[in-house]
Design a protein with these regions (language model features):
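Coiled-coil-like amphipathic alpha-helices with heptad-repeat character
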Residues: 5, 22-24
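Short hydrophobic alpha-helices and adjacent helix-cap/hinge residues
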Residues: 25-319
Length: 319
């Protein structure tokens, strides 16, 4: 009888022991520290400073838009604005910064204030920027000469002799122009100048020998006053002039040949990607592969040239 009375008690004791064991097991599990995730390092994006001077804000904006935010950390600096320049000391402290400079004033700031790699564009007189021992590379401000003369010949089939006047530091352009002219059956008559007034004198002296003139964007041997006199004299003496700036069309030039902003941007980006990947074999100067031809229709009519179907068109090199 006693055993029957103790049976419920034993059942309760066993149940309590089971519950205690389960609770204890859960406590031991809770006490086990959680597995910590293995930290992963986030790679730092290459830092780029885009320096630009007056007149190149749009090109700087185009370049910034062309650099993916997922690939580069970009800072833009207008070197002509004091408030914008204040960030330069901070940028100088970044050891792996790459500077892209647009225009000569910006390129000079990049050369003088930074020690790292520099890529410049929109600079014709670039020789002063190529500091020995520095990684400084540029994108040529002159579009391919062979493309220029081919388009000129299409527009003006009768052109046979083109004049070219350059300063001594750009004498290498003479051989390039002669090669480009030969491919289109055009002779190049060349002179070396040391000043703007000498350029005008040399041009007037060569006028009887030429029917076209190739102007290069060299402010060492050209000035606004000389450009006006030269273009006026050219028109009155039957010389068609190809210029480097669209604004000079209004002064009487026949046509302008300029690099496209899009191609210059692509070329700068390609050089930048090479630097970011450790490339060290790029040449000091890289030539663009695309140019835009703009025509002064009134001047074309004055010289009796065939009526063009368009006043502007883009030409690309075949690589």
């Amino acid at each position: 009888m006693q055993r029957r009375q103790d049976a419920p008690l034993r059942c309760c004791v066993i149940l309590l022991l089971v519950i205690s064991a389960v609770i204890g097991c859960n406590r031991r599990r809770a006490a086990t520290p959680p597995i910590q995730p293995v930290p992963t390092s986030v790679p730092l994006l290459p830092e780029v400073a885009i320096l630009f001077s007056n007149g190149y804000a749009a090109m700087a904006a185009d370049l910034r838009a062309a650099l993916p935010r997922t690939a580069y950390k970009v800072t833009s600096v207008d070197v002509d604005v004091d408030e914008s320049r204040r960030i330069i000391p901070t940028l100088r402290q970044k050891s792996k910064l790459v500077v892209v400079a647009i225009g000569l004033p910006a390129a000079r700031v990049a050369r003088d204030r930074f020690n790292g790699p520099v890529i410049f564009s929109q600079v014709f007189n670039y020789q002063e920027l190529l500091v020995s021992g520095r990684s400084i590379r540029g994108v040529s401000a002159m579009p391919p000469l062979d493309l220029q003369v081919k388009e000129w010949k299409k527009l003006d089939p009768k052109i046979q002799r083109i004049g070219l006047i350059v300063a001594e530091p750009h004498s290498e352009l003479i051989a390039q122009a002669e090669k480009a002219g030969k491919a289109s059956s055009v002779a190049v008559i060349h002179e070396i100048s040391s000043s703007d007034r000498e350029t005008l004198y040399l041009f007037k002296r060569m006028t009887p020998q030429i029917d076209g003139l190739w102007l290069v964007p060299d402010d060492q041997i050209l000035s606004p006053a000389v450009l006006r006199d030269l273009l006026s004299y050219a028109r009155s003496h039957g010389v068609r002039v190809c210029v480097f700036n669209d604004a000079l069309l209004e002064w009487g030039a026949l046509m302008s040949a300029t690099p496209t902003s899009a191609d210059t941007t692509r070329t700068v980006r390609r050089l930048l990607e090479g630097l970011s990947n450790g490339a060290t074999t790029a040449p000091n100067m890289t030539t663009v592969s695309e140019l835009v031809i703009r025509l002064n229709v009134d001047v074309a009519g004055h010289f009796g040239l065939p009526s063009p179907t368009r006043a502007a068109w883009v030409v690309r090199s075949v690589r």
